[in-house]
Structures are given as C-alpha cells and as structure tokens.
C-alpha cells in the first residue's frame, strides 16, 4: 500500500503526510483511544481507524477505537518505524515552502507585542531575584569575559583564522566598553604598549568604526529540517558573533551553577531532560512541552525586561545584538525578536526566559508571591534545555496557556 501510494502521490507522502499520521497515532496512544479529529483525510475502516496500516492498527485498538489491554508493541514499533523513517529526509525545501517560511518569519516578528498580565509581572520580579544570584550586577562580570569565535558560518563568509582579522568594529560595542583594544585579541586584558610595537600590530590596520545605521544585518537562511518546514538560521556578522560568545559563556556557566537554576537549566548535558522525558512517559508525573518558533518568539522587550534590574549587563547584551535581518528575498527588516538561532546568546537567553515564565505561571496560579524561597521551591519540577521544556504533567495545560498569553506558541498534540 505504501509503495503504491508513493508512486501516485510522490515523496511528500513519506516526508509530510505519513509523519502527520504518526503524530495522530501517538496522540491516540496517549489518550488511550482514537483521538477526536485524528487521521483527517485518511479513508476510515469499519472500526473507525484508517484503512491505511489497518493490519497493524487492529492489533493496537479495538473495534470501538479504544486501546487494547494487550496492544502489540511490535505493531506500535512498526507503525512508528514506517511513518517516521523519512520525516527528516535531507532534501531542500521547495521554493514555494521557502517563500512561505520567509513570510512566516516576518509575520512571527510582527506578532510580537508586550504583555502586561500577572504571569508577565511575576516573570519580571523573578528575573530580578535570579539576576542578583547570577552575579550580573555592576561591572564586575566584564573582568571574566572571554570572547571567542565559534565554528559556524558568518555574515561575511569568513572562516578559520581569518575571523581574527577585524576590519570593522561597532561603535555600539565601544560605547559599553567592549573595545577593540581591550577585547580584540580574545581576552579581557587590554592590548599593551609592547603589543602595539610588535610587527603584527604595526602592520595591521585598525578596524573601521561602524555606526549603528551602517551595521550589517544578520543573513537569514533556511536549512532543511523537514520538507514541510525549514529551520530558520540567522548568520551573524563575525564581530557580533565574537562578542556574543563572551556573554554567552559567562551566562551559561552561572545559570548551570546558580542556586536557583543548577541542574534545572542545562547547556552541556541534554541527557538530564532525556531521562526525565522517559520517566515522565512511564510515570505520567512529568510532561514535555513542544514549542513552535521558540527562539523567534522571544521578544526584545521580554529580554530588556528580564535584565531590567541589571542595566549594565543588559546594555552589553543589547550592544552585541543584531537589530536587522536580511531575508533570502533581499528584504531587510528591523527585528522585534531578540535573536534567531545563529546568535550565540539565543540559547542561554531563551532558556532563561522559558524557565522564569514557567515558574511565574506556577506561582501565579498557586497564589504565591515571588520571593527567593518561592522561586526555589517552584523551580524544582521545571527543567529547561533551550526550548526543550519539562514541567509537572498536571500543570502542563495551564502552563501552556500562560506561555501563550505572553506570546509563545505551544504545539498541542
């Protein structure tokens, strides 16, 4: 059946249609019965489930659509294997889908508006408590910054050691103290007089100062994720990426060791969330939230509010944030989002935003005011790895509602 349908319908059956079929199948397994509205577009059999893969489905669900007590694990594995083996087949998306993705990128950015609900007010209060513990106040953190170049692509198509040859330096970075003469060689110690008389410094031209309006935008590219939806990557200018790495490393280190977030906000070990997701699937105590357009829905306003209590650190974060993006169409837009994937600060900042928003949701619904002790107690059942979020299962629906109330989008399935 599958072979004949591929011959008639093409590759999209394997890469788009059947993976969607599997999503409905997994939802039905979770409910213990055929999910309402599931398998739309698939011709039904007499028992109510689709005729497609009917031979397997009859070993999982009874004639009334309920999960069998002795459902065949082999049948379940076979359905998932067949439905998902080509879900992430490495193929370029069609021009039509890339055009749709460009429009979705703009629409998502335009939809970001400030929130003023109680969850968001609690979010800001909790952020002030956490930022104090993260040692972000004052200028002390600047002595510990270690800028570096990442392995990824850059806006200027520069790679390898050529990244160290800075030809442009943004005045926004100079204004906060991230100057070429202090950080241009990858340490927080300034370039000395003896350095300046060395041949490599004498022969090198200093970077050209770049005013904010002349900064290059990030280059938005769409890379294969699924054939239905490509992944958005924002390729940063080499200087911005260099500065972002300094703050990113500092923030990640302190979030992973902070009293309130250690073991709950992770960057170096994803297995914590993987083990907890498996445990939650077995026990039903924990649930995983699946975010859509996660990083693209973290707004600049949210990040500014999160770091409001640490204005000096906030200014540094904003100074190394690209403010505009160039789409594959050549259009350039001013960004309302904080950053897309590709910014070195995207991952730690979005992790912090999601972590605090979830805790704020739990406390708001419990009628508990934000304090140091309540931040600690309400964070114990929350685990974040980027946009991989694990929360108490009995609160998952309410937390999802509150995440959406502040502008995020949760895939409900």
Named regions from a protein language model:
Residues 190-413:
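Core nucleotidyl-transferase/polymerase catalytic module
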Residues 1-221:
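Non-catalytic, polymerase-adjacent accessory regions of viral genome-replication enzymes
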């Amino acid at each position: 059946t599958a072979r004949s349908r591929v011959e008639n319908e093409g590759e999209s059956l394997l890469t788009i249609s059947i993976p969607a079929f599997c999503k409905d199948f997994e939802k039905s397994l979770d409910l213990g019965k055929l999910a309402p509205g599931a398998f739309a577009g698939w011709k039904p059999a007499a028992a109510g489930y689709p005729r497609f893969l009917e031979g397997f489905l009859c070993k999982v669900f009874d004639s009334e659509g309920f999960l069998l007590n002795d459902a065949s694990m082999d049948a379940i594995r076979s359905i998932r294997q067949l439905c998902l083996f080509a879900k992430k087949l490495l193929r370029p998306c069609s021009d039509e889908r890339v055009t749709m993705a460009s429009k979705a990128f703009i629409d998502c950015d335009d939809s970001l508006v400030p929130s003023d609900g109680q969850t968001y007010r609690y979010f800001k209060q909790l952020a002030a408590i956490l930022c104090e513990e993260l040692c972000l106040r004052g200028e002390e953190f600047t002595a510990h910054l270690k800028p570096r170049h990442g392995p990824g692509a850059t806006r200027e198509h520069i790679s390898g050691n050529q990244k160290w040859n800075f030809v442009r330096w943004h005045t926004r970075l100079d204004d906060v103290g991230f100057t070429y003469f202090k950080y241009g060689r990858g340490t927080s110690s300034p370039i000395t007089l003896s350095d300046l008389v060395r041949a490599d410094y004498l022969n090198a031209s200093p970077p050209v100062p770049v005013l904010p309006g002349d900064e290059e935008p990030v280059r938005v590219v769409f890379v294969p994720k699924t054939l239905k939806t490509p992944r958005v990557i924002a390729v940063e200018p080499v200087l911005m990426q260099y500065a972002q790495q300094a703050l990113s490393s500092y923030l990640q280190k302190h979030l992973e060791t902070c009293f309130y977030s250690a073991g709950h906000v992770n960057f170096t070990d994803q297995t914590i969330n993987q083990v907890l997701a498996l445990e939650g699937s077995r026990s039903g105590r924990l649930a995983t939230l699946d975010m859509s357009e996660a990083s693209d829905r973290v707004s600049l306003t949210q990040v500014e509010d999160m770091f409001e209590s640490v204005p000096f650190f906030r200014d540094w974060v904003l100074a190394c944030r690209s403010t505009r993006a160039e789409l594959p169409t050549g259009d350039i837009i001013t960004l309302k989002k904080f950053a897309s994937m590709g910014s070195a600060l995207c991952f730690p900042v979005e992790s912090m935003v999601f972590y605090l928003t979830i805790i704020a949701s739990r406390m708001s619904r419990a009628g508990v005011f934000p304090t140091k002790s309540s931040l600690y107690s309400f964070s114990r059942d929350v685990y974040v790895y980027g946009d991989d979020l694990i929360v108490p299962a009995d609160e998952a629906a309410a937390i999802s509602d509150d995440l959406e109330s502040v502008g995020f989008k949760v895939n409900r399935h």
